[in-house]
Amino acid sequence: MAKEIKFSEEARRAMLRGVDKLADAVKVTLGPKGRNVVLEKKFGSPLITNDGVTIAKEIELEDPFENMGAKLVAEVASKTNDVAGDGTTTATVLAQAMIREGLKNVTAGANPMGIRKGIEKAVAVAVEELKAISKPIEGKDSIAQVAAISAADEEVGQLIAEAMERVGKDGVITLEESKGFTTELDVVEGMQFDRGYVSPYMITDSDKMEAVLENPYILITDKKVSSIQELLPVLEQVVQQGKPLLIIAEDVEGEALATLVVNKLRGTFTAVAVKAPGFGDRRKAMLQDIAILTGGEVITEELGRELKSTTIASLGRAAKVVVTKEHTTIVDGAGRAEDIQARINQIRAQLEETTSEFDREKLQERLAKLAGGVAVIKVGAATETELKERKLRIEDALNATRAAVEEGIVAGGGTALMNVYSKVAAIEAEGDEATGVKIVLRAIEEPVRQIAQNAGLEGSVIVERLKTEKPGIGFNAATGEWVDMIEAGIVDPTKVTRSALQNAASVAAMFLTTEAVVADKPEENKNTPGMPDMGGMM
């Protein structure tokens, strides 16, 4: 396929048009008075959002050169989202400002490589200063503030803070769509996995359709159990103890299942069978987790263990087990604290090494089940469109909160970037390098300017006053007042601000050093001739 090539100024100008189209669509969402953007969906209702990365990913431009520019800035948003989970609009605004200012200077004859050096130098100083002014996050109230600012909703802030308090730093917080109108928090304490009872005849509470076992023994195996002869020795020992039994196996079927059900119905003893969670190697790991949590052993032929020679000493214990049609929850397992801690440390080590996002998510889930718990925020709304928008906002708030716990917080509303202004301005540089530093200085004003403009105010006036205010004092665009940002609860996670600045600078530097752009030539549609008449037909 034939290619079209553009060089130097012409290439950069074409890409800049794409950058501006994307950034202008994204930046209207910035700040407490930012607007929403409506995205068309081929199927179903349109998506209304103020999430920068969601908007950026949707934008495809017709001109291939403009599209390349737009895609570069979309990458800034995407990368910031991957690292910090929020701050994508800020990153886009910073990137647009750096590219725009940089291009003016390159057009005027500045050397792009010198400018790049200056940008990198300035960003390094700004990042160091951001880390220096960062404050660690303390207490439930601080967490609630970070979440409330990100989601623009105080109720959501309180929900996330409560969820984090209840599941701890190793816990997992997930989002689900609720059937109702309200957003609620549901916390599952203990080890829960997505497998229910094998037979509904095993239930003990017919109103709730669940089996509740108090102080049960827990048999854990990766085998398929079909013969009752294999289970008999261990069953007899459990019956003598007068305790119920939970069997976690690959499957329980045939004669074994029938015997368990008949004994349950006759009231001889209570046993509930559930299938083992997960698949393949993950199943083995999860069974081992359950064994460590309950103080039992996994009965597997890989270790030369057979079911029929199992004794009661190999079984796990728990204070309570609740089994529903779809879930099994083990509460208060009897495993030794040091064994559980060793397993947690092992999973943490795997988490640090893994490169797969999927594996990371699964390891995090396992860690939560062993260490903290799992909190589910059920998002409710009146319409499907509102539900999607609300879910995206809460997801951002959740990510922002995690980032804040990790690296601390700085003043929000673009104030933190303005607080590092003097440090960046003091950098000693000459020539094109000094120009690069000035480009960063102009760019770090941009978020404040944009937040003010979205609130219907003159951005330049706010920026100039901010330069004279003492550090930490900023402009609250929601109320129009000048306040101590951290005291007023207007905060941003340091990680979010830092990632936005670093990613914007990285893409801007690449953009300015571009000298040629190659794109596919659009194919001309040659109209195919119509079919000839078929004589005599009506």
Swiss-Prot record:
Compartments (UniProt record): Cytoplasm
InterPro entries: Chaperonin_Cpn60_CS, Cpn60/GroEL, Cpn60/GroEL/TCP-1, GroEL-like_apical_dom_sf, GROEL-like_equatorial_sf, TCP-1-like_intermed_sf
CDD domains tied to this protein: GroEL
The keyword Glycoprotein is annotated on this UniProt entry: no
GO molecular function: ATP binding; ATP-dependent protein folding chaperone; isomerase activity; unfolded protein binding
A GO cellular component entry from the record: cytoplasm
GO biological process: protein refolding
Main localization category: cytoplasm
Sites where the protein binds ATP: 29-32, 86-90, 413, 476-478, 492
E.C. number: 5.6.1.7
Keyword Isomerase annotated: yes
UniProt superkingdom: Bacteria
Reaction equation(s) it catalyzes: ATP + H2O + a folded polypeptide = ADP + phosphate + an unfolded polypeptide
Keywords noted in UniProt: ATP-binding, Chaperone, Cytoplasm, Isomerase, Nucleotide-binding
Assembly, per entry: Forms a cylinder of 14 subunits composed of two heptameric rings stacked back-to-back. Interacts with the co-chaperonin GroES.
Family from the record: Belongs to the chaperonin (HSP60) family.
Function summary: Together with its co-chaperonin GroES, plays an essential role in assisting protein folding. The GroEL-GroES system forms a nano-cage that allows encapsulation of the non-native substrate proteins and provides a physical environment optimized to promote and accelerate protein folding.
NCBIfam families registered for this protein in UniProt: GroEL (TIGR02348), PRK00013.1 (NF000592), PRK12849.1 (NF009487), PRK12850.1 (NF009488), PRK12851.1 (NF009489)
Protein's name in the database: Chaperonin GroEL
Species of origin: Anoxybacillus flavithermus (strain DSM 21510 / WK1)
Record lineage: Bacteria, Bacillati, Bacillota, Bacilli, Bacillales
